[in-house]
Design a protein with these regions (language model features):
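Active-site-proximal, well-structured secondary-structure segments within enzyme catalytic domains
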Residues: 128, 132-133, 161-164, 171, ...
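N-terminal helix-rich structural modules
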Residues: 1-193, 629
Length: 681
C-alpha cells in the first residue's frame, strides 16, 4: 500500500514520516486528486435539491485525502527539499491547477451554491454555517463560474501557468541561494565576527574540503552576522551583491522574465474576472478594501517615519566618516556601520547578549508565556516520528487538560531548507462529520544559528523576536474553535493574519518577561541590569530606517500588482523596481543586475501578492492591541482571555474589523505604533 496514503496508526493521527517514501507522493497525489474529483462530481450529479448539507457542507468536507497528502508534502518541499521532491511538485502542479479550475469554473456546481445562497434566510443557519455559505458563494461568484466557455478555458490556462511559474520562482531562489559560497582564509578579514558564526563557517569549510579557513553562505545565520561584523568592505560587497543577485544572474535560475510573465498573467486573471488590476481584485476581500486605502496607509506612515530615518542615516554616516569610511555609505556598508554606531552610542552588541538567550531556555520561556497568558501547556513527545532529527514534537493541552494539538519545531538551517521563518498547518482544526473536534498539527520552521561542538544554540534578540512572531501564528492555529476547516485558525484575510504573530513580539521589550528566563548559559548569571537598560535605550534604534525599508517593500509589491496594461517583453525589472520604491529608499541603488524583486518570494511564490502592506497594516493593529495589555497588565489573564475569545479562537467566523473591535472596543489608529517607535505627533 502507498506509504503516504495509509491511515495513521499513531497518537492524534500524526504523520508517520519515518515510513514515507518520496516516490510514493506521485501516486498519493494522483489518488487524492481523483478522490476529490469524484466527491465533487457526486455533489454536482446529486438528484436532490441543493441544501446546505448536500452542497456547501459536502464541498467543505471533500478532499480529505488531498489535504492529508498536501499537508506533509509541501512542508517537506520547503523544509527538507530534494531534487525528487521538487520534480514531483512540478509534475503535480498542472493536475492540482486543473482540479481547482474544474471545481471553481463548474456552472452546475455554482448553480447549486447559488440556490442555497438565495434561500439562506429560510435555512435557519447559525452564524458559522452562514459565514461558510457566504465565503463559498463569494469565492465561486468571483472565480469565473459564469464566464463564457472561451474565457473559462483561458482562465484555466492562466491559473495553470501561474501555479507552475510561482513554483519555479521559489525553486530558482532556493537553488541559486544555496549554491553560493564565500571562502575566507585571512583571519584579519573575519576579525570581530561572532564566535558562533565563525565556528559554523569553520565546520562547513572542513566539511566541503576547503582546508583552513571559513566558508560563508547566504543563509540568514551566516549572511547577517557577516554583513554586520566583517571589517572588509570588499568582502561585504561580494556577499551583498551575491545576495541581491539571487534570481538575476542570467542563467537557468534567472527570475526576471518569469516575473514579467507572472504579473502579466495575474493582470489577465483579474481582468477576466472583472477587475482593473490584480491588486483591485485581491483587496476587495481584505481589511484594506482598496488600493486607495493601502497607499493611504503607506503614505501616512512614510510621512511619519522618513524624517526620522533621514536623521538616523545622517548620524550613522557622520559616525562612519569620522571612523574613516568613504561616503556615501553603500548598501553593503550600512549594516556594518549601523552596528558599530549602536555599539559606540548604546554600548550594545547583540552578540554580547547571545549567551543569555540559549535556545532551549528561550523555547521554555515562550511556552511558559503562553501558559501564563492562556493556560495552555506543552509536553515534549519523543515517540512520534519526525522528518529530520532536528525536529521536536510537543503535545499541547488546555488549562482543563483537554488536548489542543501537536506542535513541531524545526530550528536550524540545512541543505534543501528554504531561508526565513514560517508557520505551517500540517493538519487543520475542524469538526468531523461525526462531530469530533479534529485538532491541528502545526510546524514552526526557523533558521537559527546552529549549535557547535562546544556551544549550544544561542540566539540574538532579533532571533528571539522571530521565534515569538511565528509562535504567535501557531497560537492562532492552536486555539481555533471553528467547525469548518476553511474558516479555522490562520485562514483569515492576509492583512489580519499578522496580528497574532506581531502581537507576541511585544513581550521581548518587557523587562519583567526577560527577567523570568534570560540567564547566561554557562554561569547562570541573570541578564545584567546594565544590559537591560542598554536594550531599552536602543529600543528605537533605526526605527525610522526599518519602517521605511518595510514600506519600500509594500510600494514595490503594489507597483507590480497595480499595472493595468501588460508589461512589454524585454522589461528591465531593475529599473521598474528602482522607480517603484524610490520615495521610500534611503541608500544608493545597487548596481544592475542586483535587485530585490528577483528573490521577493513573499509576493511571487509565497501568497503575499498585493498583500505585503499587510505587515504594516497589522503592525498598526498589534501596537494598538498591546496597548490594552499595557493598560491592564502585560500578563493580564483577563485581557489574554478576551484576545483568545474574540480573535485567536475565531478564525474567519466574522469580519476581521469586527473581531478586532470586539477585542479592543474601538478602531485602531497609528498613534500607538508611533509611540512605540518613539515618534510623537
Amino acid at each position: 500500500m502507498n506509504s503516504i496514503c495509509q491511515p495513521s496508526q499513531l497518537p492524534h493521527g500524526a504523520y508517520a514520516f519515518d515510513q514515507f517514501k518520496t516516490e510514493d507522493f506521485r501516486e498519493a497525489f494522483r489518488l487524492a486528486i481523483e478522490e476529490k474529483r469524484r466527491e465533487v462530481e457526486a455533489i454536482i450529479a446529486s438528484p436532490e435539491a441543493p441544501t446546505f448539507a448536500n452542497t456547501i457542507l459536502a464541498l467543505e468536507r471533500s478532499g480529505a485525502l488531498l489535504e492529508w497528502v498536501s499537508g506533509s508534502f509541501y512542508n517537506l518541499l520547503h523544509a527538507e527539499a530534494t531534487d525528487e521532491l521538487m520534480q514531483i511538485s512540478q509534475e503535480v502542479s498542472p493536475s492540482l491547477s486543473a482540479l481547482s479550475s474544474f471545481i471553481t469554473l463548474s456552472e452546475p456546481l455554482f448553480e447549486r451554491i447559488r440556490q442555497v445562497w438565495e434561500a439562506r434566510e429560510s435555512l435557519q443557519l447559525d452564524a458559522e454555517d452562514l459565514r461558510l455559505l457566504e465565503r463559498c458563494y463569494e469565492g465561486f461568484s468571483e472565480s469565473g463560474a459564469q464566464l463564457p466557455a472561451e474565457e473559462k478555458e483561458r482562465l484555466r490556462e492562466v491559473k495553470r501557468e501561474l501555479s507552475e511559474l510561482s513554483l519555479t520562482f521559489g525553486q530558482n531562489n532556493l537553488k541559486d541561494q544555496q549554491r553560493f559560497r564565500l571562502f575566507v582564509d585571512d583571519a584579519a578579514a573575519v576579525e570581530g565576527l561572532p564566535l558562533s558564526t565563525l565556528a559554523v563557517a569553520r565546520e562547513l569549510a572542513e566539511k566541503e574540503g576547503k582546508g583552513e579557513g571559513w566558508l560563508f553562505t547566504l543563509s540568514a545565520p551566516s549572511y547577517f552576522p557577516f554583513m554586520q561584523h566583517c571589517p572588509s568592505s570588499t568582502l561585504r560587497q561580494e556577499m551583498y551583491l551575491a545576495k541581491m543577485a539571487v534570481g538575476a544572474a542570467g542563467d537557468a535560475y534567472d527570475n526576471r522574465e518569469l516575473i514579467r510573465r507572472l504579473v502579466n498573467l495575474r493582470l489577465e486573471l483579474a481582468q477576466l474576472l472583472g477587475s482593473k488590476s490584480f491588486a483591485e481584485k485581491v483587496l476587495t476581500r481584505r481589511m484594506a478594501g482598496s488600493t486607495t486605502a493601502v497607499y493611504g496607509l503607506l503614505d501616512e506612515l512614510l510621512e511619519a517615519y522618513k524624517p526620522l530615518a533621514e536623521k538616523e542615516l545622517a548620524a550613522v554616516a557622520d559616525f562612519a566618516r569620522e571612523a574613516g569610511a568613504t561616503l556615501p555609505l553603500q548598501p553593503w556598508d550600512w549594516s556594518y556601520w549601523a552596528e558599530r554606531y549602536k555599539q559606540a552610542f548604546y554600548e550594545l552588541d547583540e552578540e554580547e547578549l547571545r549567551p543569555y538567550f540559549e535556545l532551549s531556555r528561550v523555547s521554555d520561556a515562550i511556552f511558559s508565556l503562553a501558559t501564563r497568558l492562556y493556560g495552555i501547556r506543552f509536553t515534549e513527545c519523543t515517540d512520534l516520528p519526525v522528518y529530520h532529527s532536528d525536529v521536536h514534537t510537543y503535545e499541547v493541552h488546555d488549562a482543563d487538560g483537554s488536548y489542543l494539538g501537536l506542535l513541531y519545531t524545526d530550528f536550524f538551517p540545512r541543505e534543501g531548507k528554504q531561508s526565513g521563518a514560517w508557520m505551517n498547518n500540517l493538519q487543520e482544526q475542524y469538526h468531523t462529520a461525526e462531530g469530533e473536534d479534529h485538532r491541528p498539527h502545526i510546524v514552526l520552521v526557523m533558521n537559527f544559528t546552529q549549535p557547535t561542538a562546544d556551544r549550544p544554540a544561542l540566539l540574538t534578540p532579533g532571533e528571539v523576536r522571530t521565534f515569538l512572531h511565528e509562535f504567535g501564528h501557531s497560537l492562532h492555529g492552536m486555539l481555533s474553535t471553528c467547525r469548518h476547516g476553511s474558516l479555522s485558525g490562520t485562514n483569515v484575510v492576509r492583512d489580519f493574519v499578522e496580528l497574532p504573530s506581531q502581537l507576541m513580539e511585544n513581550w521581548l521589550d518587557e523587562r519583567e518577561w526577560l527577567q523570568s528566563f534570560a540567564v547566561h548559559y554557562q554561569t547562570g548569571e541573570a541578564l545584567p541590569e546594565v544590559l537591560m537598560e542598554r536594550m531599552e535605550r536602543a529600543r528605537h534604534f533605526l526605527a525610522g530606517y526599518a519602517a521605511c525599508r518595510q514600506l519600500s517593500f509594500g510600494y514595490l509589491d503594489m507597483a507590480w500588482h497595480t499595472i493595468t496594461e501588460p508589461l512589454a517583453e524585454g522589461l528591465d525589472t531593475k529599473t521598474f523596481e528602482d522607480t517603484a520604491w524610490q520615495k521610500a529608499q534611503l541608500l544608493p541603488a545597487t548596481p544592475a543586475p542586483c535587485q530585490m524583486s528577483t528573490s521577493f518570494g513573499h509576493i511571487f511564490s509565497g501568497g503575499y501578492a498585493a498583500g505585503y502592506y499587510g505587515y504594516k497594516w497589522a503592525e498598526v493593529l498589534d501596537a494598538d492591541a498591546f496597548a490594552a495589555f499595557q493598560e491592564e497588565g502585560i500578563f493580564s489573564t483577563a485581557t489574554a482571555e478576551r484576545f483568545r475569545r474574540e480573535v485567536l479562537s475565531q478564525g474567519d467566523r466574522r469580519d476581521a474589523e469586527e473581531l478586532y473591535q470586539s477585542f479592543r472596543g474601538k478602531k485602531a489608529t497609528i498613534d500607538a505604533l508611533l509611540r512605540r517607535d518613539g515618534i510623537e505627533r
